[in-house]
């Protein structure tokens, strides 16, 4: 049997798995125990569902046992009905009505409360995971694809819900039914029941082998589903690039490859699931057949010809023995659900246990002038050194442009200023205070960011501009920010003005319009330090001119750190910092650097883009 199971291939495809970094996987029992602890506050739902299941199963088992007294006492000699047996039959009828009523009540109670428990588990886990994602460091999102993370939030939680609802109720309900049927079998014939116990260890061995196979298959399926989600999300997000570069077939092949692997894993799970029940049924049928031979041979005592097995006990025993196959089958099937849930639980707890963004500071600055000092800053991604000994002094109100070739460390530097990453050496001071000594919330409250790749939300213009502000923002404030960002003119022309939904990531707007909405958002926040990753190289001349005017309006009232790509930006900057290979190689004003004839001169002559 083990060889048959081993033929179901369990090879993994080396796909990305969020829990792949866990060197020692927690044991199934520990994971399941922790899973139940997550919903311990819902114990009353589980208790009521369990009580309902017990009533349901006890009523079912009792009705099977009624076969015994009905056959033994409900009929007179020769199979006829006597006055006494008629009374017994009527009592049995009343008893069956009562048992059916108990069964119905138990069914409703168990299904209602276990369904409620399942929905509460979905709600709790998705809420906890989403809340956790809000506090995870940038390194987490660098390591894991969007599709993988979304798959964990949606698909994995559904798998866990099955374990805490369907699986639990099946274990309790069918487990109770099995116990009840075993009691019926022992009461009907303890001799035959003892014989059936022999099969227990064989079933246990078979199920333990199946458990391991299911767990491996489930883990592979969880991972491959994440890859499918990621590829689909990537395709939808980048549909323009895919079509322009004629990569439809390549992207389709990538998606189909991941889908094929997921399909193969699911088919293997189905095959293993389909194999489990027939094997158990074959074992059980062989035992029942052997029992019949035993009864035929040893069913009577040699002395007086009396039997240790009456017609009623025989019928109730075999009715119970036949009925026990279905709950046993259900209990073996629930193993599939549990193993899927265990694999899903690993990834969910991986996210929930992932170290949050480090909060190293406790200080808070109520007001900031905007002086930024960078001293001997060094940083590396693993073995790859990105910044080395960077020192820059930025006075309040200055506009400092960072220029350099791609990969010179400009964007990484701004990420460290925002503390999305923490430097390995050196320090960054904000008004003389090390940024690591400030709370993350306080530090970031003094910063505004306008990204090269503008990020807008599928919401109204108003909500995008007032995004993140804890105070109430009036329409007048939003309109003022739009005017200063040279955006109010086109917003007025939208169907609902500032209350117009702009689509996914501002898809209903042009590139220049999206830039200006982003600038208006920074204007409304009015932070003393602005980080601007310039992207005007992607705009037409008119849009560039309007965005430049909006940027000038924004930089008048704050310290501005610009990752510059345009000549007009560097020409007007108070200071230019030239970076190469993660180091500052030149620093000064535009004309001074041109006269030096170094890297800046070459970048300037090439247009800086």
UniProtKB/Swiss-Prot annotation:
Pfam families: ABC_membrane (PF00664), ABC_tran (PF00005). It catalyses: ATP + H2O + lipid A-core oligosaccharideSide 1 = ADP + phosphate + lipid A-core oligosaccharideSide 2. SUPFAM superfamilies: ABC transporter transmembrane region (SSF90123), P-loop containing nucleoside triphosphate hydrolases (SSF52540). ATP binds at residues 404-411. Residues 372-606 form the ABC transporter domain. Residues 47-340 form the ABC transmembrane type-1 domain. Disulfide bonds: none annotated. It comes from the Bacteria. Involved in lipopolysaccharide (LPS) biosynthesis. Translocates lipid A-core from the inner to the outer leaflet of the inner membrane. Transmembrane domains (TMD) form a pore in the inner membrane and the ATP-binding domain (NBD) is responsible for energy generation. Belongs to the ABC transporter superfamily. Lipid exporter (TC 3.A.1.106) family. In MsbA the ATP-binding domain (NBD) and the transmembrane domain (TMD) are fused. This is ATP-dependent lipid A-core flippase. It comes from Francisella tularensis subsp. holarctica (strain LVS).
């Amino acid at each position: 049997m083990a060889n048959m199971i081993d033929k179901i291939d369990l090879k993994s495809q080396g796909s990305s798995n969020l829990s792949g970094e866990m060197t020692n996987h927690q044991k199934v029992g520990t994971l399941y125990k922790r899973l139940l602890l997550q919903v311990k506050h819902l114990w009353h739902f589980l208790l009521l569902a369990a009580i309902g299941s017990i009533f349901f199963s006890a009523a079912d088992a009792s009705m099977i046992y009624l076969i015994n007294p009905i056959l033994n006492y409900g009929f007179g000699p020769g199979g006829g009905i006597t006055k006494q047996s008629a009374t017994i039959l009527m009592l049995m009828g009343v008893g069956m009505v009562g048992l059916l009523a108990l069964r119905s009540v138990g069914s409703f109670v168990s299904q209602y409360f276990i369904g409620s428990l399942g929905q509460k588990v979905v709600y709790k886990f998705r809420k906890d995971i989403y809340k956790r994602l809000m506090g995870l460091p940038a390194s987490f999102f660098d390591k894991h694809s969007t599709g993988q993370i979304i798959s964990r939030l949606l698909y994995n939680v559904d798998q866990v819900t099955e374990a805490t609802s369907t699986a639990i109720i099946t274990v309790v309900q069918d487990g109770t039914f099995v116990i009840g049927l075993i009691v019926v079998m022992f009461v009907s014939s303890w001799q035959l029941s003892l014989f059936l116990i022999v099969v227990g260890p064989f079933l246990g061995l078979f199920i333990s082998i199946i458990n391991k196979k299911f767990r491996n298959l489930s883990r592979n399926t969880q991972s491959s589903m994440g890859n499918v989600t990621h590829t689909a999300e990537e395709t939808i997000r980048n549909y323009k690039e895919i079509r322009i570069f004629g990569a439809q077939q390549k992207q389709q092949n990538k998606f189909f490859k991941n889908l094929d692997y997921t399909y193969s894993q699911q088919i293997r799970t189905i095959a293993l699931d389909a194999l489990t029940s027939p094997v158990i049924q074959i074992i059980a049928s062989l035992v029942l057949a052997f029992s019949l031979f035993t009864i035929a041979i040893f069913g009577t005592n040699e002395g007086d010809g009396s039997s240790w097995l009456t017609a009623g006990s025989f019928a109730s025993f075999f009715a119970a023995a036949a009925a026990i196959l279905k709950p046993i089958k259900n209990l073996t099937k629930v193993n599939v659900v549990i193993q899927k849930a265990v694999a899903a639980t690993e990834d969910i707890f991986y996210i929930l246990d992932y170290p949050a963004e480090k909060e190293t500071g406790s200080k808070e600055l109520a007001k900031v002038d905007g002086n930024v000092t960078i001293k001997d800053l060094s940083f590396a991604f693993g073995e790859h050194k990105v910044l080395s000994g960077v020192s820059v002094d930025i006075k309040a109100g200055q506009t400092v442009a960072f220029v350099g070739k791609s990969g010179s460390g400009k964007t990484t530097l701004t990420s460290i200023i925002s503390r999305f990453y923490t430097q390995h050496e050196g320090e960054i001071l904000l008004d003389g205070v090390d940024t690591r000594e400030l709370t993350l919330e306080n530090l970031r409250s003094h910063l505004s960011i306008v990204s090269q790749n503008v990020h807008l939300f599928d919401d109204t213009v108003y909500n995008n501009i007032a995004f993140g502000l804890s105070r109430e923002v009036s329409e007048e404030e939003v309109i003022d920010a739009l005017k200063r960002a040279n955006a109010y003119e086109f917003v007025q022309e939208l169907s609902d003005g500032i209350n117009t939904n702009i689509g996914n990531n501002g898809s209903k707007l042009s590139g220049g319009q999206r830039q200006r909405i982003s600038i208006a958002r920074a204007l409304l926040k009015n932070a003393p330090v602005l980080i601007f990753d310039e992207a005007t190289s992607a705009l037409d001349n008119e849009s560039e001119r309007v965005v430049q005017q909006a940027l000038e309006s924004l930089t008048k009232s704050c310290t501005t750190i610009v990752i510059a790509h345009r000549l007009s930006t560097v020409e007007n900057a108070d200071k230019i910092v030239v970076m190469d290979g993660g180091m500052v190689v030149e620093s000064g004003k535009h004309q001074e650097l041109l006269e030096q004839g170094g890297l800046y001169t070459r970048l300037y002559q090439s247009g800086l883009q």
